């Protein structure tokens, strides 16, 4: 699942991931993401941190309470404290925007194994 409030970024990520054979669901806010997590199972959640109705921290914490899942933070926040906070919230990986798609693909491969 991809959780991103910026429509263009969400569209590009969804197309690229689909092109490389990943099944995806998309959400543009925390509430939508949490509703989707209630009804579907995922291997990985890719989530922005800053969402209009909450945060990616909340999304990954609640998603991990529902199912065994890997989390990838996709964010503009790239300081050491931001990375630490992502890990504490439950993210397994932290990628700073702009995201290197090859790095993201390697992480998805690692997360899926």
Question: What are the functions of these language-model segments?
Answer:
Residues 7-25:
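Two-component/phosphorelay signaling modules centered on CheY-like receiver
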Residues 10, 52, 79:
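The feature encodes the CheY-like receiver
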Residues 14, 81, 99-108:
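C-terminal output helix
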Residues 21-29, 36-37:
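Short hydrophobic/Thr-rich beta-strand motif most characteristic of the beta2 strand and flanking loop
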Residues 29-32, 55-58:
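Acidic catalytic/metal-coordinating carboxylates
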Residues 40-46, 51:
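Active-site beta3 strand of CheY-like receiver
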Residues 58, 78-94, 106:
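Alpha4 helix (beta4-alpha4-beta5 surface) of REC/receiver domains from two-component response regulators
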